[in-house]
Structure formats: structure tokens, C-alpha cells
Design a protein with these regions (language model features):
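Conserved hydrophobic register position within alpha-solenoid helical repeats
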Residues: 81, 124, 155, 186, ...
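Short inter-helical turns and helix N-cap capping residues of alpha-solenoid HEAT/ARM repeat scaffolds
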Residues: 73-74, 114-117, 147-148, 178-179, ...
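Extracytoplasmic/periplasmic/luminal assembly and interaction segments
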Residues: 72-75, 79-130, 134, 180, ...
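Amphipathic alpha-helical scaffolding segments comprising HEAT/armadillo-like alpha-solenoid repeats
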Residues: 56-70, 91-113, 133-145, 164-176, ...
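N-terminal intrinsically disordered, acidic low-complexity segments at the extreme N-terminus
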Residues: 1-24
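Structural signature of alpha-helical solenoid repeat scaffolds
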Residues: 86-90, 129, 160, 191, ...
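Hydrophobic membrane-insertion alpha-helices, especially the h-region
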Residues: 34-54
Length: 326
């Protein structure tokens, strides 16, 4: 069988490529352009114009916008606006856009929220911690006796953020409440306030019957370079101690320490037992580092070598390496 001549093949390809287009081919091309390409192009241009105009007209909601929604919005929109309010308050105050009139309006809306969806009041109490203003302190102190426990907890965290020592006696009172969750929140709130009454109150909480209240007290003291809670920190680092307390029993986020403020206030999903254990150990390790408590070096060395959580190991490594460099 004769082999095809390469030159002949190339000639045929060139002839086909340069051959005149038939009328039928031209008609088909025009139909495709008319019924497919042109309509699609028109749709894409219209979509681009719509999106462009949308981006030009959409404005970021301000704190005033959210506050107005809380006043006049529907059932769901009110609590959602209260939730979002906290995300913009801090920045707007930093930029000087929060004036006296807004603070007064925020207080009035909070006071009027008593018969509303409890979430509105909870999130408003939390939002008050995102800005500092003396007028908010009295309102938050009054909210410590709110019938809704979550609102009380949020108010305690916001009082810590305000940094006003007027809240100290009220938080000390709650630190002896029958509810361990409220006691823990009060201890955390006290830890952020500078007042002579705070250290004795935290030292008293080191003997609380609830472990996580004791842990919080030890951490708050350590943050102030007070080593009165060193024994409690040692307990937290003891092998099997956390597991022996039923840490993996699925208890709620509210009843565990060392979450971020948003977690404690119920604004994030419940953490897994593994993450809760990790957070507890890492916070305890950091506290040991703050106190330069080298007597607990063996516990840190064990965590560095044997703990199953790599982040816990890393936290221990950082403290131990820091000690070696000194």
C-alpha cells in the first residue's frame, strides 16, 4: 500500500483552509450569531450594568441604622440588628462617629427592650462592651439583676470592658451566687478591673466548689502577675485531671472557661470537647509563663513530649524555650 505523500497532505489542508465559504455556511453562521451570540452578549452586558450599579448604591450599615432597625424592625430583624450592632460600634467610636446623642438612644432602646425578644436585650448588653462611655456603666450595673441570666452574663463582660471600678462591689456580690455560670462570669469580669477589692475576691474564688470558677480565678490573678492561684494552675496541668472532671461529657459552652467573649456570650457554635480541653491547657500554660513559675516545668515538659494535641505541645515548647533563653 502506497504511503501518503506529506507534501500532498499539506497542500490539501491549505486548499481546504483557503477555499471560499459556501452560502449555506454563511447562513448558518449568521443564524448562530443572531440567535445565540448576540442575546448572550446582551444578557452579560445587562448583568454587568446591574451589578455595577448595585455596588455603587449599596452602603455599609451604620450603628445608627442598626439601632433604628431595633426600634421599628420586625421580630427577627430586631435581634439580628442588635447582634450586628456590636460589629460596628467599636470602629465607629474609634473613628469619632459615636456622639452623645447615640449613647442616649442606645440606653433608651435597651431600657425599652425588657418586654422584647430576650435576644435583643442580650445582644445590646454585649454591644455596650464594644464602646467605652461612663453613661453605660450604671445601665450595665442595673442589668446585673436582669431576669435573663444571659443578659446578666453579657452585662458582666461589658462591665469588664468598660473598666470602671464602680462595678466591683456588684460583681463581688454575684461571685457568691448559687449559679456557677454566673459566678464564673463575675470572676472574669473582676479580672479586668483595677481596684484593691479585686485580688482578695479572686483569691476567695480559688476555693470555689466549681472547678471552672477556680480556674478562671487563677487565670485572672496570673494575668495580674499574682501567683496566689499557682496551685490551681498545677492541678489544671496534672495528667488526667481535666478528663476526670468529665470534660468530654458535652456540657455547654457557657459552663466552660477560657472561651472568647463571643463564645461565652453564646454568639458562636458550641466547641468540641477536644477544643475545650486544648483551650484550657493553653491558657494554663500561658499563665504559668506569665508567672515565670518554673516549679511547674516538669508538667510543661510532659505536655511538650506526650500531649496528643500539637497546639498544646507548641504552647509548652514556647514557654520552656523562653526559660532556657533567659
Amino acid at each position: 500500500m502506497d504511503q501518503p505523500n506529506p507534501e500532498e497532505e499539506l497542500r490539501k489542508i491549505a486548499e481546504d483552509a483557503t477555499a471560499p465559504v459556501s452560502d449555506a455556511d454563511v447562513s448558518r453562521a449568521r443564524l448562530v450569531s443572531q440567535f445565540v451570540i448576540f442575546p448572550v452578549a446582551i444578557i452579560l452586558v445587562a448583568l454587568a450594568i446591574y451589578l455595577g450599579l448595585g455596588l455603587l448604591t449599596v452602603e455599609r450599615k451604620t450603628a445608627e441604622d442598626y439601632l433604628n432597625t431595633i426600634r421599628v424592625g420586625g421580630i427577627n430583624s430586631r435581634w439580628q440588628a442588635a447582634y450586628e450592632l456590636a460589629t460596628v460600634l467599636e470602629q465607629e467610636q474609634r473613628e469619632g462617629r459615636i456622639g452623645r446623642r447615640f449613647v442616649g438612644e442606645l440606653i433608651r432602646v435597651f431600657e425599652a427592650s425588657r418586654p422584647d425578644d430576650p435576644r435583643v436585650r442580650r445582644y445590646l448588653a454585649a454591644a455596650m462592651g464594644r464602646m467605652r462611655d461612663p453613661e453605660l456603666v450604671g445601665v450595665l450595673i442595673a442589668a446585673l439583676d436582669d431576669p435573663d441570666d444571659e443578659t446578666r452574663i453579657n452585662a458582666m463582660f461589658s462591665l469588664r470592658a468598660q473598666g470602671d471600678p464602680d462595678a466591683v462591689p456588684h460583681l463581688i456580690r454575684i461571685a457568691s451566687n448559687d449559679d456557677a455560670g454566673l459566678r464564673k462570669a463575675a470572676v472574669y469580669g473582676l479580672g479586668g478591673l483595677d481596684d484593691p477589692l479585686v485580688p482578695p475576691a479572686l483569691e476567695q474564688a480559688l476555693h470555689d466548689r466549681a472547678p471552672d470558677v477556680r480556674w478562671n480565678a487563677a487565670l485572672q490573678l496570673a494575668a495580674a502577675s499574682n501567683n496566689a492561684g499557682l496551685e490551681v494552675l498545677g492541678e489544671m496541668l496534672t495528667p488526667g485531671y481535666l478528663e476526670g472532671l468529665g470534660l468530654n461529657s458535652g456540657q455547654s459552652t457557657r459552663n466552660l472557661p477560657f472561651e472568647t467573649i463571643r463564645s461565652v456570650l453564646g454568639l458562636s457554635e458550641q466547641q468540641s470537647p477536644t477544643i475545650r480541653r486544648r483551650n484550657i491547657l493553653i491558657e494554663a500554660i500561658k499563665a504559668v509563663g506569665i508567672l515565670d513559675a518554673r516549679s511547674l516545668a516538669p508538667e510543661l515538659q510532659r505536655l511538650r513530649e506526650k500531649d496528643p494535641d500539637l497546639r498544646v505541645r507548641q504552647a509548652a515548647i514556647e514557654i520552656l524555650n523562653g526559660w532556657e533563653e533567659k
